[in-house]
Amino acid sequence: MSEVKKIATRESYGNALVELGKKYENLVVLDADLAGATKTGIFQKAYPERHIDCGIAESNMMGIAAGLSTTGKVPFASTFAMFAAGRAFEQVRNSIAYPKINVKIGATHGGISVGEDGAKIGRASCRERV
């Protein structure tokens, strides 16, 4: 029996993006200055021309993803869950959900702590969910 290698879900996400990138040339990945934490950096190394770092601007990232989708791209917008659901809510609702735009949102770090990837005071965690 082979032993299963245990890895973080976010690492699986980064690896899955690379596999999808092999299959779909129109796939692009966006992140909000979190390529290391969300593991989109794995995709960035494999396909640097199809990765966009939007900086610490989640709302803007969602708008960019929506725009890219209208040109035939399949964008994966990736950030911490708190910022995808909180900071970028209006853009997700108005620019992606209402017009039914084909944007995939990858939200990591959805628990009550972001561990080694965030401030100890919890600004990047999803404590409201508790």
Name these PLM-found stretches:
Residues 1-127:
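Thiamine diphosphate
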